[in-house]
A protein has these predicted regions:
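Short coil/turn connectors at secondary-structure junctions
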Residues: 61, 71-72, 104, 110-111, ...
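Active-site-facing alpha/beta catalytic cores
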Residues: 55-58, 101, 185-188
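Iron-sulfur-associated redox domains of electron-transfer enzymes in respiratory
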Residues: 115-189
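Alpha-helix capping and helix-loop boundary segments enriched in small/acidic/polar residues
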Residues: 53-54, 89-100, 111-114, 150-157
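Terminal amphipathic helices with adjacent charged low-complexity linkers/tails
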Residues: 16, 79-86, 95-103, 114-128
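Generic beta-strand/beta-sheet core signal
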Residues: 59, 69, 77-80, 89, ...
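Ferredoxin-type iron-sulfur electron-transfer modules and their immediate structural context
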Residues: 1-95
Length: 189
């Protein structure tokens, strides 16, 4: 499996939380004595879901969760034997596949072959641009869970703190999503 896997673990989004990395470390595999045969398939880097075929270990978890849990069938197996690959079903592009962008395939991928597009640099560029007004919206899930990452109790991890942090980073306006939900309720009466 390692001979067909891009082992650039340091820069991988799953580094430290990768099943293959864990197994390789547990078995004390440091060097790969086999010739690397990494196949890279083209992918639209503008799409919110990023697929890196060079990391795919063909475990089929994405295929199963998309079909059985979401009922969408975006992913499918192509080829047989050593030529087996996981790709968008029906020889379509991901844009044509009716992907709901639910993130289930990303969550179930054990090796980082599927991930969310990282727009961090774009955000920093927008904040640095004096001609742009940057607005941030904090979703309820983030509002309730962000303190966990920093070891803060629920009393310490307030909405005000995260909104203040966004303002200090340079965001012009920061809103809690519940604000817009309240406006909608008031509008619709």
């Amino acid at each position: 499996i390692l001979s067909q896997h891009d082992c650039e673990c340091v820069t991988c989004s799953r580094s430290g939380n990768c099943s293959l990395q864990t197994v390789a470390n547990d078995l004390n595999i440091i060097d790969i004595p086999f010739k690397m045969e990494i196949e890279r398939q083209p992918w639209n880097k503008e799409f919110p879901l990023i697929r890196d075929s060079s990391k795919c270990i063909k475990c089929m978890r994405c295929v199963q969760v998309c079909e059985k849990v979401q009922g969408l069938g975006v992913w499918d197996v192509e080829g047989t034997g050593s030529r087996t690959t996981i790709n968008v079903a029906g020889h379509r592009t991901i844009e044509e596949a009716d992907c709901a962008l639910c993130g289930q395939c990303i969550t179930h991928c054990p090796v980082g072959a599927l991930r969310v597009r990282d727009d961090t640099e774009d955000i920093w560029d927008a904040i640095a641009d004096p001609d742009k007004i940057v607005v941030a919206q904090v979703a309820p899930a983030v509002r309730t869970a962000w303190g966990e990452e920093f070891g803060l109790s629920d009393d310490e991890a307030t909405v005000g703190k995260i909104l203040d942090a966004l303002k200090r980073m340079g965001v012009d306006y920061a809103f809690d999503t519940t604000f817009s939900a309240d406006l909608t309720i008031m509008e619709e009466g």
